[in-house]
From Swiss-Prot:
Keywords: Hydrolase, Periplasm, Purine metabolism, Signal. Changing H31A: Loss of activity. The keyword ATP-binding does not apply. Belongs to the transthyretin family. 5-hydroxyisourate hydrolase subfamily. This is 5-hydroxyisourate hydrolase. The gene is hiuH. The keyword Signal applies. GO terms for cellular component: periplasmic space. Changing H120A: Reduces activity by 90%. GO terms for molecular function: hydroxyisourate hydrolase activity. Homotetramer. Substrate binds at H31, R69, Y133. InterPro entries: Hydroxyisourate_hydrolase (IPR014306), Thyroxine_BS (IPR023418), Transthyretin/HIU_hydrolase (IPR000895), Transthyretin/HIU_hydrolase_d (IPR023416), Transthyretin/HIU_hydrolase_sf (IPR036817), Transthyretin_CS (IPR023419). Its EC number is 3.5.2.17.
């Protein structure tokens, strides 16, 4: 029994830094807080797109965790300067709470100029409004 507990502890100590490192190397993260409840918004789909010519190309998608975060949204490829957007698909989040919303999708466009920096896009959300900014 003691060996099993010790093995579990050692495995978690080895895995945690590796996961943190993977998220730490990723240049893009998002976070959603529900302003009406003051709590994170888990399970929200977020789509990352890159502007190409006259349209948008999907690069990645993910769902927020229990803390309302996606710590590593950038796909496993090199980042390039350019125009991008994240689309927060909030309609299902409010529908699951049996609430109406005026914004079923919230696209947030941003520009990446330096690929060696981290970009964090927080979303403060309510049924009829939202706010965002470049976080850290």
């Amino acid at each position: 029994m003691k060996r099993h507990i010790l093995a579990t502890v050692i495995a978690s100590l080895v895995a945690a830094p590796a996961m943190a490192l993977a998220a730490g190397n990723n240049i893009l993260s998002v976070h959603i807080l529900d302003q009406q409840t003051g709590k994170p918004a888990p399970g929200v789909e977020v789509v990352l797109e890159q502007k190409k010519d006259n349209g948008w190309t999907q690069l990645n998608t993910g769902h927020t965790d229990q803390d309302g975060r996606i710590k590593a949204l950038w796909p496993e490829k090199a980042a390039a300067p350019g125009d991008y957007r994240v689309i927060f698909k909030t309609g299902q989040y409010f529908e699951s709470k049996k609430l109406d919303t005026f914004f079923p999708e919230i696209p947030v466009e941003f520009h990446i100029s330096k690929t060696n920096e981290h970009y964090h896009v927080p979303l403060l959300l309510s049924q009829y409004g939202y706010s965002t900014y470049r976080g850290s």
